[in-house]
Swiss-Prot record:
Protein's cellular compartments: Cytoplasm
UniProt keywords, alphabetically: Aminoacyl-tRNA synthetase, ATP-binding, Cytoplasm, Ligase, Nucleotide-binding, Protein biosynthesis
Function: Catalyzes the attachment of proline to tRNA(Pro) in a two-step reaction: proline is first activated by ATP to form Pro-AMP and then transferred to the acceptor end of tRNA(Pro). As ProRS can inadvertently accommodate and process non-cognate amino acids such as alanine and cysteine, to avoid such errors it has two additional distinct editing activities against alanine. One activity is designated as 'pretransfer' editing and involves the tRNA(Pro)-independent hydrolysis of activated Ala-AMP.
E.C. code: 6.1.1.15
SUPFAM superfamilies for the chain: Class II aaRS ABD-related, Class II aaRS and biotin synthetases, YbaK/ProRS associated domain
Protein name per Swiss-Prot or TrEMBL: Proline--tRNA ligase
Catalyzed chemical reaction(s): tRNA(Pro) + L-proline + ATP = L-prolyl-tRNA(Pro) + AMP + diphosphate
Gene: proS
Record remark on domains: Consists of three domains: the N-terminal catalytic domain, the editing domain and the C-terminal anticodon-binding domain.
Species annotation: Burkholderia ambifaria (strain ATCC BAA-244 / DSM 16087 / CCUG 44356 / LMG 19182 / AMMD) (Burkholderia cepacia (strain AMMD))
Example of a GO cellular component annotation carried by this entry: cytosol
Signal peptide from the UniProt entry: none
Length: 578
Protein backbone atom coordinates (compact mmCIF):
# COMPACT_ATOMS: atom_id res chain seq x y z
CA UNK A 1 0.00 0.00 0.00
CA UNK A 2 1.24 3.48 -0.87
CA UNK A 3 0.03 6.40 1.20
CA UNK A 4 -0.80 8.49 -1.88
CA UNK A 5 -3.46 5.90 -2.75
CA UNK A 6 -4.77 5.53 0.79
CA UNK A 7 -6.99 7.81 2.87
CA UNK A 8 -5.25 9.37 5.87
CA UNK A 9 -7.58 11.62 7.85
CA UNK A 10 -5.50 12.66 10.87
CA UNK A 11 -6.49 15.67 12.97
CA UNK A 12 -4.46 17.89 15.28
CA UNK A 13 -7.29 18.34 17.80
CA UNK A 14 -9.83 15.97 19.29
CA UNK A 15 -13.54 16.89 19.31
CA UNK A 16 -14.86 18.59 22.41
CA UNK A 17 -17.18 15.68 23.28
CA UNK A 18 -14.32 13.15 23.44
CA UNK A 19 -13.73 12.36 27.13
CA UNK A 20 -11.34 9.41 27.19
CA UNK A 21 -8.04 8.71 25.46
CA UNK A 22 -9.30 6.06 23.05
CA UNK A 23 -12.12 8.27 21.76
CA UNK A 24 -9.78 11.21 21.26
CA UNK A 25 -7.11 9.18 19.51
CA UNK A 26 -9.49 7.20 17.30
CA UNK A 27 -10.90 10.45 15.95
CA UNK A 28 -7.51 12.16 15.62
CA UNK A 29 -5.94 9.12 13.95
CA UNK A 30 -8.68 9.08 11.32
CA UNK A 31 -10.20 5.80 12.49
CA UNK A 32 -13.76 6.94 13.19
CA UNK A 33 -16.10 9.84 12.55
CA UNK A 34 -19.36 10.46 14.40
CA UNK A 35 -22.63 10.12 12.47
CA UNK A 36 -25.01 10.39 15.44
CA UNK A 37 -24.79 9.78 19.18
CA UNK A 38 -23.06 6.43 19.65
CA UNK A 39 -22.98 5.73 15.88
CA UNK A 40 -19.77 6.00 13.85
CA UNK A 41 -18.33 5.72 10.38
CA UNK A 42 -15.24 3.51 10.39
CA UNK A 43 -12.72 5.10 8.05
CA UNK A 44 -10.07 3.03 6.20
CA UNK A 45 -7.49 3.14 9.02
CA UNK A 46 -10.06 1.97 11.57
CA UNK A 47 -11.52 -0.67 9.29
CA UNK A 48 -8.11 -2.25 8.71
CA UNK A 49 -7.74 -2.82 12.45
CA UNK A 50 -11.30 -4.14 12.71
CA UNK A 51 -10.62 -6.66 9.95
CA UNK A 52 -7.51 -7.88 11.77
CA UNK A 53 -9.45 -8.38 15.00
CA UNK A 54 -12.13 -10.24 13.04
CA UNK A 55 -9.54 -12.48 11.39
CA UNK A 56 -8.06 -13.58 14.71
CA UNK A 57 -11.52 -14.18 16.18
CA UNK A 58 -12.59 -16.22 13.14
CA UNK A 59 -9.45 -18.34 13.20
CA UNK A 60 -9.90 -19.21 16.86
CA UNK A 61 -13.64 -19.83 16.55
CA UNK A 62 -13.03 -22.19 13.63
CA UNK A 63 -10.18 -23.85 15.52
CA UNK A 64 -12.57 -24.49 18.43
CA UNK A 65 -15.07 -26.16 16.11
CA UNK A 66 -17.64 -23.36 15.88
CA UNK A 67 -19.54 -22.92 12.60
CA UNK A 68 -20.08 -19.47 11.10
CA UNK A 69 -23.50 -18.28 9.96
CA UNK A 70 -25.18 -14.89 9.68
CA UNK A 71 -28.43 -13.88 11.36
CA UNK A 72 -30.47 -10.75 10.62
CA UNK A 73 -29.99 -7.54 12.56
CA UNK A 74 -33.77 -6.97 12.35
CA UNK A 75 -35.76 -9.50 14.38
CA UNK A 76 -39.52 -10.06 14.77
CA UNK A 77 -40.99 -9.13 18.13
CA UNK A 78 -42.69 -12.52 18.44
CA UNK A 79 -39.38 -14.23 19.21
CA UNK A 80 -38.62 -11.76 22.00
CA UNK A 81 -42.13 -12.15 23.36
CA UNK A 82 -41.65 -15.92 23.46
CA UNK A 83 -38.47 -15.61 25.51
CA UNK A 84 -39.99 -13.02 27.83
CA UNK A 85 -37.32 -10.43 27.07
CA UNK A 86 -39.71 -8.14 25.15
CA UNK A 87 -40.82 -6.83 28.55
CA UNK A 88 -37.60 -7.48 30.46
CA UNK A 89 -35.12 -5.69 28.22
CA UNK A 90 -36.51 -2.17 28.59
CA UNK A 91 -35.83 0.94 26.47
CA UNK A 92 -32.37 -0.23 25.36
CA UNK A 93 -34.19 -2.53 22.93
CA UNK A 94 -34.92 -0.49 19.80
CA UNK A 95 -38.43 -1.38 18.65
CA UNK A 96 -40.23 -0.32 15.49
CA UNK A 97 -43.18 -1.23 13.26
CA UNK A 98 -43.09 -2.03 9.58
CA UNK A 99 -45.66 -0.75 7.06
CA UNK A 100 -47.99 -3.63 7.97
CA UNK A 101 -47.93 -2.64 11.65
CA UNK A 102 -45.82 -5.66 12.65
CA UNK A 103 -43.46 -5.17 15.60
CA UNK A 104 -39.72 -5.65 15.10
CA UNK A 105 -36.51 -4.98 17.00
CA UNK A 106 -32.95 -4.21 15.98
CA UNK A 107 -31.10 -6.91 17.84
CA UNK A 108 -28.69 -6.11 20.67
CA UNK A 109 -28.08 -9.87 20.83
CA UNK A 110 -29.32 -13.00 19.06
CA UNK A 111 -30.34 -15.67 21.61
CA UNK A 112 -33.92 -15.71 20.36
CA UNK A 113 -33.07 -15.99 16.67
CA UNK A 114 -30.48 -18.74 17.14
CA UNK A 115 -32.84 -20.69 19.42
CA UNK A 116 -35.44 -20.47 16.66
CA UNK A 117 -32.88 -21.91 14.23
CA UNK A 118 -32.03 -24.73 16.63
CA UNK A 119 -35.61 -25.74 17.39
CA UNK A 120 -36.38 -25.97 13.68
CA UNK A 121 -33.14 -27.62 12.52
CA UNK A 122 -31.93 -29.81 15.40
CA UNK A 123 -34.17 -32.82 15.98
CA UNK A 124 -31.88 -35.50 17.45
CA UNK A 125 -29.10 -35.83 20.00
CA UNK A 126 -26.96 -37.06 17.09
CA UNK A 127 -26.87 -33.49 15.71
CA UNK A 128 -25.19 -32.16 18.85
CA UNK A 129 -22.96 -30.67 20.02
CA UNK A 130 -23.14 -27.75 17.63
CA UNK A 131 -21.85 -24.20 18.04
CA UNK A 132 -22.99 -21.44 15.69
CA UNK A 133 -21.23 -18.07 15.54
CA UNK A 134 -21.49 -14.84 13.60
CA UNK A 135 -19.86 -11.42 13.37
CA UNK A 136 -22.75 -9.00 13.09
CA UNK A 137 -23.76 -5.41 13.78
CA UNK A 138 -25.77 -4.94 16.98
CA UNK A 139 -27.74 -2.00 18.31
CA UNK A 140 -28.44 -1.09 21.93
CA UNK A 141 -30.26 2.19 22.49
CA UNK A 142 -28.05 3.48 25.31
CA UNK A 143 -29.62 6.36 27.21
CA UNK A 144 -26.28 8.19 27.21
CA UNK A 145 -23.82 6.93 24.62
CA UNK A 146 -20.31 8.14 25.41
CA UNK A 147 -16.62 7.26 25.27
CA UNK A 148 -16.63 6.62 21.52
CA UNK A 149 -16.73 2.91 20.67
CA UNK A 150 -16.55 1.98 24.35
CA UNK A 151 -20.23 2.70 24.93
CA UNK A 152 -21.77 3.19 21.53
CA UNK A 153 -25.27 2.37 20.39
CA UNK A 154 -24.26 0.54 17.21
CA UNK A 155 -21.38 -1.90 17.52
CA UNK A 156 -19.83 -4.94 15.89
CA UNK A 157 -19.83 -8.16 17.87
CA UNK A 158 -18.91 -11.80 17.53
CA UNK A 159 -21.55 -13.92 19.21
CA UNK A 160 -21.54 -17.71 19.41
CA UNK A 161 -24.21 -20.09 20.70
CA UNK A 162 -23.65 -23.73 21.64
CA UNK A 163 -26.29 -26.46 21.88
CA UNK A 164 -25.68 -29.67 23.84
CA UNK A 165 -27.67 -32.69 24.94
CA UNK A 166 -26.47 -32.74 28.57
CA UNK A 167 -24.55 -30.87 31.23
CA UNK A 168 -21.30 -32.68 30.49
CA UNK A 169 -21.54 -31.54 26.88
CA UNK A 170 -22.33 -27.95 27.89
CA UNK A 171 -19.33 -27.92 30.23
CA UNK A 172 -17.10 -29.10 27.39
CA UNK A 173 -18.48 -26.50 24.96
CA UNK A 174 -17.97 -23.82 27.60
CA UNK A 175 -14.38 -24.94 28.21
CA UNK A 176 -13.60 -24.83 24.49
CA UNK A 177 -14.94 -21.30 24.19
CA UNK A 178 -13.16 -20.16 27.35
CA UNK A 179 -9.89 -21.53 26.00
CA UNK A 180 -10.55 -19.95 22.59
CA UNK A 181 -11.06 -16.56 24.25
CA UNK A 182 -7.78 -16.89 26.12
CA UNK A 183 -6.07 -17.55 22.78
CA UNK A 184 -7.87 -14.64 21.11
CA UNK A 185 -6.90 -12.03 23.67
CA UNK A 186 -3.37 -13.39 23.91
CA UNK A 187 -2.98 -13.11 20.14
CA UNK A 188 -4.41 -9.60 20.22
CA UNK A 189 -1.43 -8.64 22.38
CA UNK A 190 -3.51 -7.36 25.29
CA UNK A 191 -3.07 -7.62 29.05
CA UNK A 192 -6.32 -9.19 30.21
CA UNK A 193 -7.97 -11.18 32.97
CA UNK A 194 -10.77 -13.72 32.86
CA UNK A 195 -13.03 -13.09 35.84
CA UNK A 196 -16.03 -14.82 37.37
CA UNK A 197 -19.09 -12.72 36.67
CA UNK A 198 -22.83 -12.19 37.03
CA UNK A 199 -24.95 -13.20 34.04
CA UNK A 200 -27.03 -10.00 33.93
CA UNK A 201 -29.95 -9.69 31.49
CA UNK A 202 -28.69 -12.56 29.32
CA UNK A 203 -29.59 -14.95 32.14
CA UNK A 204 -28.18 -18.34 32.98
CA UNK A 205 -25.97 -19.86 35.62
CA UNK A 206 -22.21 -19.83 35.12
CA UNK A 207 -20.29 -17.03 33.41
CA UNK A 208 -16.90 -15.37 32.99
CA UNK A 209 -15.98 -11.93 31.70
CA UNK A 210 -12.78 -11.11 29.86
CA UNK A 211 -11.40 -7.71 30.80
CA UNK A 212 -8.61 -5.66 29.28
CA UNK A 213 -6.76 -4.08 32.20
CA UNK A 214 -6.84 -0.28 31.99
CA UNK A 215 -7.07 2.55 34.52
CA UNK A 216 -10.06 3.98 32.65
CA UNK A 217 -12.04 0.74 32.86
CA UNK A 218 -15.66 1.01 34.00
CA UNK A 219 -15.57 -2.28 35.90
CA UNK A 220 -13.77 -3.01 39.16
CA UNK A 221 -12.02 -6.37 39.23
CA UNK A 222 -11.11 -8.17 42.43
CA UNK A 223 -8.09 -10.42 42.01
CA UNK A 224 -5.44 -12.15 44.06
CA UNK A 225 -1.86 -11.31 43.00
CA UNK A 226 -0.58 -14.61 44.42
CA UNK A 227 -3.14 -16.92 42.79
CA UNK A 228 -5.37 -17.26 39.72
CA UNK A 229 -8.46 -15.88 41.45
CA UNK A 230 -10.21 -13.02 39.66
CA UNK A 231 -13.84 -11.89 39.67
CA UNK A 232 -15.90 -8.88 38.79
CA UNK A 233 -16.41 -7.00 42.03
CA UNK A 234 -20.16 -7.60 41.57
CA UNK A 235 -19.56 -11.35 41.82
CA UNK A 236 -16.56 -11.65 44.16
CA UNK A 237 -17.45 -13.34 47.44
CA UNK A 238 -16.67 -11.48 50.65
CA UNK A 239 -15.70 -14.22 53.09
CA UNK A 240 -16.94 -14.31 56.69
CA UNK A 241 -14.40 -13.40 59.34
CA UNK A 242 -12.54 -16.35 60.81
CA UNK A 243 -12.27 -14.92 64.33
CA UNK A 244 -15.14 -15.52 66.72
CA UNK A 245 -17.36 -12.60 67.67
CA UNK A 246 -16.01 -10.80 70.73
CA UNK A 247 -18.10 -10.74 73.89
CA UNK A 248 -19.93 -7.46 74.69
CA UNK A 249 -17.73 -5.01 76.57
CA UNK A 250 -19.99 -1.95 76.63
CA UNK A 251 -23.50 -1.12 77.77
CA UNK A 252 -25.94 0.04 75.12
CA UNK A 253 -26.16 3.84 75.28
CA UNK A 254 -28.03 6.53 73.37
CA UNK A 255 -25.60 9.28 72.32
CA UNK A 256 -26.16 12.71 70.80
CA UNK A 257 -24.76 13.10 67.27
CA UNK A 258 -26.12 16.50 66.15
CA UNK A 259 -25.91 16.93 62.39
CA UNK A 260 -23.88 13.73 61.96
CA UNK A 261 -25.84 11.62 59.47
CA UNK A 262 -22.87 9.88 57.81
CA UNK A 263 -20.88 7.03 59.33
CA UNK A 264 -17.62 8.91 58.84
CA UNK A 265 -18.93 11.94 60.76
CA UNK A 266 -20.30 9.77 63.57
CA UNK A 267 -17.00 7.91 63.92
CA UNK A 268 -15.07 11.17 64.07
CA UNK A 269 -17.42 12.68 66.67
CA UNK A 270 -17.33 9.60 68.90
CA UNK A 271 -13.59 9.09 68.34
CA UNK A 272 -14.04 5.49 67.24
CA UNK A 273 -12.87 3.58 64.16
CA UNK A 274 -15.20 3.77 61.17
CA UNK A 275 -15.24 -0.04 61.28
CA UNK A 276 -17.38 0.10 64.46
CA UNK A 277 -20.22 2.00 62.79
CA UNK A 278 -23.13 0.47 60.88
CA UNK A 279 -24.41 1.70 57.53
CA UNK A 280 -28.18 1.08 57.33
CA UNK A 281 -29.73 0.77 53.87
CA UNK A 282 -33.50 0.44 53.49
CA UNK A 283 -35.01 -1.54 50.62
CA UNK A 284 -38.60 -2.34 49.71
CA UNK A 285 -40.38 -5.12 47.84
CA UNK A 286 -43.95 -4.86 46.62
CA UNK A 287 -46.86 -6.97 47.85
CA UNK A 288 -49.95 -6.99 45.66
CA UNK A 289 -52.86 -5.36 47.46
CA UNK A 290 -50.84 -4.67 50.61
CA UNK A 291 -48.16 -2.34 51.88
CA UNK A 292 -44.58 -3.17 50.88
CA UNK A 293 -42.17 -5.32 52.82
CA UNK A 294 -39.37 -3.16 54.23
CA UNK A 295 -35.87 -4.58 54.53
CA UNK A 296 -32.98 -3.17 56.56
CA UNK A 297 -29.58 -4.13 55.13
CA UNK A 298 -26.78 -3.61 57.64
CA UNK A 299 -23.22 -3.01 56.44
CA UNK A 300 -20.04 -2.01 58.23
CA UNK A 301 -19.48 1.72 57.89
CA UNK A 302 -16.54 1.36 55.50
CA UNK A 303 -18.25 -1.18 53.23
CA UNK A 304 -20.45 -0.70 50.14
CA UNK A 305 -23.68 -2.44 49.20
CA UNK A 306 -23.56 -4.97 46.36
CA UNK A 307 -26.98 -4.81 44.71
CA UNK A 308 -26.29 -7.82 42.51
CA UNK A 309 -25.77 -10.00 45.58
CA UNK A 310 -28.83 -8.53 47.28
CA UNK A 311 -31.04 -9.26 44.26
CA UNK A 312 -30.15 -12.96 44.52
CA UNK A 313 -31.41 -13.28 48.09
CA UNK A 314 -34.84 -14.89 48.67
CA UNK A 315 -37.57 -12.29 48.38
CA UNK A 316 -35.31 -9.51 47.09
CA UNK A 317 -35.11 -10.22 43.35
CA UNK A 318 -37.24 -7.18 42.46
CA UNK A 319 -36.21 -4.89 45.29
CA UNK A 320 -36.05 -1.12 45.13
CA UNK A 321 -34.74 1.54 47.48
CA UNK A 322 -37.37 2.66 49.96
CA UNK A 323 -38.77 6.16 49.59
CA UNK A 324 -38.06 8.77 52.24
CA UNK A 325 -41.71 8.66 53.31
CA UNK A 326 -41.56 4.87 53.73
CA UNK A 327 -38.42 5.26 55.84
CA UNK A 328 -40.18 7.78 58.08
CA UNK A 329 -43.27 5.55 58.33
CA UNK A 330 -41.29 2.46 59.35
CA UNK A 331 -38.43 4.00 61.36
CA UNK A 332 -39.83 7.32 62.58
CA UNK A 333 -36.86 9.26 61.24
CA UNK A 334 -35.46 10.39 57.89
CA UNK A 335 -32.35 8.68 56.46
CA UNK A 336 -29.13 9.20 58.39
CA UNK A 337 -30.29 8.26 61.87
CA UNK A 338 -32.15 5.00 61.39
CA UNK A 339 -31.30 1.59 62.77
CA UNK A 340 -32.69 -1.78 63.86
CA UNK A 341 -33.42 -0.86 67.49
CA UNK A 342 -37.00 0.26 68.18
CA UNK A 343 -38.51 0.55 64.70
CA UNK A 344 -42.11 1.85 64.38
CA UNK A 345 -43.15 -1.11 62.20
CA UNK A 346 -41.60 -4.55 61.76
CA UNK A 347 -38.76 -4.74 59.24
CA UNK A 348 -36.76 -7.65 57.91
CA UNK A 349 -33.13 -7.31 58.95
CA UNK A 350 -30.25 -8.76 56.94
CA UNK A 351 -26.75 -8.31 58.32
CA UNK A 352 -23.69 -8.62 56.17
CA UNK A 353 -21.33 -11.40 57.25
CA UNK A 354 -18.92 -8.84 58.69
CA UNK A 355 -21.66 -7.09 60.67
CA UNK A 356 -22.86 -10.40 62.11
CA UNK A 357 -19.40 -10.80 63.63
CA UNK A 358 -19.30 -7.33 65.24
CA UNK A 359 -19.67 -6.37 68.88
CA UNK A 360 -20.25 -3.00 70.58
CA UNK A 361 -21.22 -1.32 67.32
CA UNK A 362 -22.99 1.99 66.65
CA UNK A 363 -26.35 2.26 64.87
CA UNK A 364 -28.90 5.00 64.29
CA UNK A 365 -31.34 5.60 67.16
CA UNK A 366 -34.37 6.21 64.91
CA UNK A 367 -34.33 9.78 66.17
CA UNK A 368 -32.80 12.79 64.44
CA UNK A 369 -29.39 13.77 65.87
CA UNK A 370 -29.00 10.56 67.91
CA UNK A 371 -27.26 7.21 67.57
CA UNK A 372 -26.97 4.18 69.85
CA UNK A 373 -23.53 2.92 70.85
CA UNK A 374 -22.53 -0.38 72.43
CA UNK A 375 -25.09 -2.47 70.52
CA UNK A 376 -24.63 -6.24 70.52
CA UNK A 377 -26.30 -9.21 68.87
CA UNK A 378 -28.14 -11.58 71.16
CA UNK A 379 -28.31 -9.04 73.98
CA UNK A 380 -29.78 -5.92 72.37
CA UNK A 381 -30.89 -7.36 69.05
CA UNK A 382 -31.97 -10.85 68.00
CA UNK A 383 -29.47 -12.79 65.93
CA UNK A 384 -29.93 -11.57 62.35
CA UNK A 385 -30.35 -13.27 59.02
CA UNK A 386 -26.83 -13.23 57.60
CA UNK A 387 -25.74 -12.92 53.96
CA UNK A 388 -22.86 -11.69 51.81
CA UNK A 389 -24.22 -8.34 50.59
CA UNK A 390 -21.14 -6.16 50.18
CA UNK A 391 -18.42 -5.43 47.67
CA UNK A 392 -15.04 -6.90 48.50
CA UNK A 393 -12.25 -4.49 49.41
CA UNK A 394 -8.52 -4.41 48.90
CA UNK A 395 -6.93 -6.49 51.65
CA UNK A 396 -9.89 -8.85 52.11
CA UNK A 397 -8.95 -12.55 52.15
CA UNK A 398 -9.10 -14.13 48.70
CA UNK A 399 -11.99 -16.62 48.34
CA UNK A 400 -9.53 -19.28 47.16
CA UNK A 401 -7.61 -19.00 50.45
CA UNK A 402 -4.33 -18.16 48.72
CA UNK A 403 -3.72 -14.54 49.66
CA UNK A 404 -5.54 -11.23 49.82
CA UNK A 405 -7.64 -9.27 47.36
CA UNK A 406 -6.40 -6.38 45.26
CA UNK A 407 -8.58 -4.21 43.02
CA UNK A 408 -7.90 -3.04 39.47
CA UNK A 409 -9.98 -1.53 36.68
CA UNK A 410 -10.98 -3.39 33.55
CA UNK A 411 -12.81 -2.93 30.26
CA UNK A 412 -15.09 -5.84 29.43
CA UNK A 413 -14.40 -7.10 25.90
CA UNK A 414 -15.72 -10.66 26.10
CA UNK A 415 -18.24 -12.69 28.05
CA UNK A 416 -19.06 -16.41 28.16
CA UNK A 417 -22.26 -17.80 29.72
CA UNK A 418 -23.75 -21.15 30.51
CA UNK A 419 -27.41 -20.50 29.79
CA UNK A 420 -28.72 -23.99 30.50
CA UNK A 421 -32.33 -24.36 29.36
CA UNK A 422 -33.45 -20.73 29.91
CA UNK A 423 -34.25 -20.10 26.25
CA UNK A 424 -34.91 -23.72 25.29
CA UNK A 425 -37.68 -23.98 27.88
CA UNK A 426 -39.19 -20.61 26.98
CA UNK A 427 -39.14 -21.25 23.22
CA UNK A 428 -39.66 -25.01 23.05
CA UNK A 429 -36.24 -25.95 21.66
CA UNK A 430 -36.20 -29.71 22.23
CA UNK A 431 -34.51 -32.77 20.73
CA UNK A 432 -35.10 -36.51 20.95
CA UNK A 433 -32.65 -38.25 23.28
CA UNK A 434 -31.26 -41.80 23.00
CA UNK A 435 -34.56 -43.24 24.24
CA UNK A 436 -36.66 -41.16 21.86
CA UNK A 437 -37.93 -38.76 24.54
CA UNK A 438 -37.98 -34.97 23.98
CA UNK A 439 -35.49 -33.00 26.09
CA UNK A 440 -34.63 -29.28 26.20
CA UNK A 441 -31.32 -28.30 24.61
CA UNK A 442 -28.62 -26.95 26.92
CA UNK A 443 -27.26 -23.66 25.64
CA UNK A 444 -24.17 -21.54 26.08
CA UNK A 445 -23.53 -18.08 24.60
CA UNK A 446 -20.20 -16.40 24.01
CA UNK A 447 -19.66 -12.77 22.97
CA UNK A 448 -16.68 -10.66 21.89
CA UNK A 449 -17.00 -6.90 21.32
CA UNK A 450 -15.07 -6.44 18.07
CA UNK A 451 -15.23 -2.66 17.89
CA UNK A 452 -14.88 -2.30 21.66
CA UNK A 453 -11.59 -4.18 21.49
CA UNK A 454 -10.10 -1.30 19.50
CA UNK A 455 -10.95 1.23 22.20
CA UNK A 456 -9.77 -1.08 24.98
CA UNK A 457 -6.47 -1.77 23.20
CA UNK A 458 -5.82 1.96 22.87
CA UNK A 459 -6.64 2.62 26.54
CA UNK A 460 -3.88 0.15 27.35
CA UNK A 461 -1.41 1.21 24.62
CA UNK A 462 -0.79 4.92 24.06
CA UNK A 463 1.58 7.78 24.82
CA UNK A 464 1.59 11.54 24.30
CA UNK A 465 2.24 11.06 20.57
CA UNK A 466 -0.68 8.74 19.89
CA UNK A 467 -1.65 5.08 19.68
CA UNK A 468 0.84 2.21 20.15
CA UNK A 469 -0.80 -0.76 18.45
CA UNK A 470 0.14 -4.36 19.13
CA UNK A 471 1.42 -5.78 15.84
CA UNK A 472 -1.53 -8.15 15.50
CA UNK A 473 -4.16 -5.42 15.11
CA UNK A 474 -2.18 -2.43 13.82
CA UNK A 475 -3.62 -0.99 10.59
CA UNK A 476 -0.10 -1.43 9.16
CA UNK A 477 2.83 -3.29 10.69
CA UNK A 478 5.56 -1.06 9.30
CA UNK A 479 5.70 2.33 7.61
CA UNK A 480 8.46 3.43 5.23
CA UNK A 481 9.26 7.14 5.44
CA UNK A 482 11.51 8.15 2.51
CA UNK A 483 13.15 11.58 2.71
CA UNK A 484 12.61 13.16 -0.71
CA UNK A 485 10.86 10.28 -2.43
CA UNK A 486 9.73 12.63 -5.22
CA UNK A 487 13.16 14.26 -5.61
CA UNK A 488 15.84 11.61 -5.15
CA UNK A 489 16.23 8.61 -7.47
CA UNK A 490 18.47 6.95 -4.86
CA UNK A 491 15.85 7.29 -2.12
CA UNK A 492 12.97 6.25 -4.36
CA UNK A 493 14.76 3.14 -5.65
CA UNK A 494 15.82 2.10 -2.14
CA UNK A 495 12.33 2.70 -0.72
CA UNK A 496 10.65 0.78 -3.55
CA UNK A 497 13.09 -2.11 -3.14
CA UNK A 498 12.54 -2.24 0.62
CA UNK A 499 8.77 -2.06 0.10
CA UNK A 500 8.89 -4.98 -2.34
CA UNK A 501 11.01 -7.09 0.02
CA UNK A 502 8.69 -6.52 2.97
CA UNK A 503 5.56 -7.15 0.92
CA UNK A 504 7.06 -10.37 -0.47
CA UNK A 505 7.70 -11.50 3.12
CA UNK A 506 4.01 -11.05 3.92
CA UNK A 507 4.49 -7.89 5.97
CA UNK A 508 1.66 -5.35 6.01
CA UNK A 509 3.65 -2.31 4.90
CA UNK A 510 2.74 1.20 3.79
CA UNK A 511 5.12 3.50 1.93
CA UNK A 512 4.56 7.19 2.59
CA UNK A 513 5.03 8.71 -0.86
CA UNK A 514 2.93 11.83 -0.18
CA UNK A 515 5.91 14.17 -0.31
CA UNK A 516 5.21 15.53 3.19
CA UNK A 517 7.89 17.04 5.42
CA UNK A 518 9.56 14.55 7.80
CA UNK A 519 7.88 16.07 10.85
CA UNK A 520 4.42 15.67 9.33
CA UNK A 521 5.12 12.10 8.25
CA UNK A 522 6.47 11.08 11.64
CA UNK A 523 3.62 12.78 13.55
CA UNK A 524 0.95 11.10 11.41
CA UNK A 525 2.32 7.58 11.78
CA UNK A 526 3.06 7.98 15.49
CA UNK A 527 -0.52 9.18 15.99
CA UNK A 528 -1.90 6.27 13.94
CA UNK A 529 0.31 3.93 15.95
CA UNK A 530 2.19 1.87 13.36
CA UNK A 531 4.54 -0.36 15.41
CA UNK A 532 7.66 -0.11 13.19
CA UNK A 533 9.16 2.72 11.14
CA UNK A 534 11.99 2.74 8.62
CA UNK A 535 13.40 6.08 7.43
CA UNK A 536 15.26 6.13 4.11
CA UNK A 537 17.48 9.13 3.34
CA UNK A 538 20.33 9.89 0.96
CA UNK A 539 22.87 10.48 3.72
CA UNK A 540 22.18 7.13 5.33
CA UNK A 541 22.07 5.28 2.03
CA UNK A 542 25.52 6.60 1.11
CA UNK A 543 26.74 4.92 4.30
CA UNK A 544 24.69 1.78 3.60
CA UNK A 545 22.30 2.52 6.51
CA UNK A 546 18.56 2.85 7.08
CA UNK A 547 17.09 4.31 10.27
CA UNK A 548 14.77 2.08 12.31
CA UNK A 549 12.56 3.00 15.27
CA UNK A 550 9.97 0.89 17.04
CA UNK A 551 6.91 2.78 18.21
CA UNK A 552 7.85 2.11 21.84
CA UNK A 553 11.55 2.92 21.35
CA UNK A 554 12.92 6.13 22.81
CA UNK A 555 15.64 6.42 20.17
CA UNK A 556 16.18 5.36 16.58
CA UNK A 557 18.92 2.92 15.54
CA UNK A 558 20.73 2.38 12.25
CA UNK A 559 20.42 -0.89 10.32
CA UNK A 560 22.47 -2.10 7.37
CA UNK A 561 20.34 -1.24 4.34
CA UNK A 562 20.55 -4.75 2.92
CA UNK A 563 19.40 -6.26 6.24
CA UNK A 564 16.60 -3.83 7.12
CA UNK A 565 13.76 -5.85 5.59
CA UNK A 566 14.88 -9.10 7.20
CA UNK A 567 15.45 -7.45 10.60
CA UNK A 568 12.02 -5.83 10.72
CA UNK A 569 10.34 -8.99 9.42
CA UNK A 570 11.96 -10.96 12.24
CA UNK A 571 10.80 -8.41 14.84
CA UNK A 572 7.22 -8.54 13.59
CA UNK A 573 7.09 -12.33 13.41
CA UNK A 574 8.52 -12.59 16.91
CA UNK A 575 5.86 -10.21 18.22
CA UNK A 576 3.06 -12.12 16.48
CA UNK A 577 4.34 -15.45 17.81
CA UNK A 578 3.64 -14.52 21.44
Amino acid sequence: MKASRFFIGTLKEAPADAEIVSHKLMVRAGMIRRVAGGIYNYLPVGLRSIRKVEAIVREEMNRAGAIELLMPAVQPAELWQESGRWEQYGPELLRFKDRKDNDFVIGPTHEEVVTDIARNQIKSYRQMPVNFYQIQTKFRDEIRPRFGVMRGREFLMKDAYSFDKDTAGLNESYRKMYDAYVRIFTRLGLEFRAVAADSGSIGGNFSHEFHVIADTGEDAIAYCPTSDFAANIEAAEALPLIAERAAPAEAMEKVATPGKAKCEAVAELLAIPLERTIKSIVLATENEGAEPTIWLIMLRGDHDLNEIKVSKLPGLKNHRFATEQEIVDWFGTPPGYLGPVGTKKPVKVIADRTVANMSDFVVGANEVDYHIAGVNWGRDLPEPEVADVRDVKKGDPSPDGKGTIDICRGIEVGHVFQLGTKYSDAMGATFLDESGKPQPMLMGCYGVGITRILGAAIEQNFDDKGIIWPESIAPFEVVLCPMGYDRSDMVREAADKLYAELAAAGIDVILDDRGERPGVMFADWELIGVPHRLVIGERGLKEGKIEYQGRRDAEATLLPADEAAATVTEKIRAALAH
